[in-house]
């Protein structure tokens, strides 16, 4: 368990630093398009998590430290949107279409609402 925690932590640092670097680079080069870095890391993170998940399905012998380190740590540090996308896809693939659509809708609109509420609380 300690090895898994270390793998997630170390890989998480790498993902977080990559996200920070992308944001810094975009801000320096395109300050009016601040959202481009978030969009890019979210899409790239989704691609990476899809590839990793597929590879790990094909190779179940890959140790949990590596799987958790890469998916939860690295991709999770890079973006949490990728985890949401994978969860939604897994629900769809298992035939739980209404649940997947509800989960996606609540995640997107609930997240926007929660962000707005949080911001509003700072303006009281």
From Swiss-Prot:
Q: Which HAMAP family match?
A: FluC
Describe activity control.
Answer: Na(+) is not transported, but it plays an essential structural role and its presence is essential for fluoride channel function.
List, alphabetically, the GO terms of the cellular component aspect.
plasma membrane
Concerning Pfam families, the annotation shows: CRCB (PF02537)
User: What name is this protein filed under?
Assistant: Fluoride-specific ion channel FluC
Biological process terms from the Gene Ontology for this record are: cellular detoxification of fluoride
MF terms from GO for this chain are:
fluoride channel activity; metal ion binding
Membrane topology term = Multi-pass membrane protein
Q: Which PANTHER family match?
A: FLUORIDE EXPORT PROTEIN 1-RELATED (PTHR28259:SF1)
**Membrane-spanning segments:** 5-25, 38-58, 69-89, 99-119
Its function, per the record, reads: Fluoride-specific ion channel. Important for reducing fluoride concentration in the cell, thus reducing its toxicity.
Similarity field: Belongs to the fluoride channel Fluc/FEX (TC 1.A.43) family.
Give the UniProt keywords, A-Z.
Cell inner membrane, Cell membrane, Ion channel, Ion transport, Membrane, Metal-binding, Sodium, Transmembrane, Transmembrane helix, Transport
Per the record, the major location class is membrane
């Amino acid at each position: 368990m300690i090895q898994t925690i270390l793998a997630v932590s170390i890989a998480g640092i790498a993902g977080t630093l990559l996200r920070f670097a992308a944001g810094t680079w975009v801000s320096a080069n395109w300050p009016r398009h601040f959202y481009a870095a978030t969009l890019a890391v979210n899409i790239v993170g989704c691609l990476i998590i899809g590839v990793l998940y597929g590879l790990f399905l094909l190779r179940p012998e890959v140790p949990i430290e590596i799987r958790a380190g890469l998916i939860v740590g690295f991709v999770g540090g890079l973006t949490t949107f990728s985890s949401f996308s994978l969860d939604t896809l897994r629900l769809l693939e298992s035939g739980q279409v209404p649940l997947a659509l509800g989960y996606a809708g609540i995640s997107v609109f609930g997240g926007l609402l929660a962000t707005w509420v949080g911001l509003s609380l700072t303006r009281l």
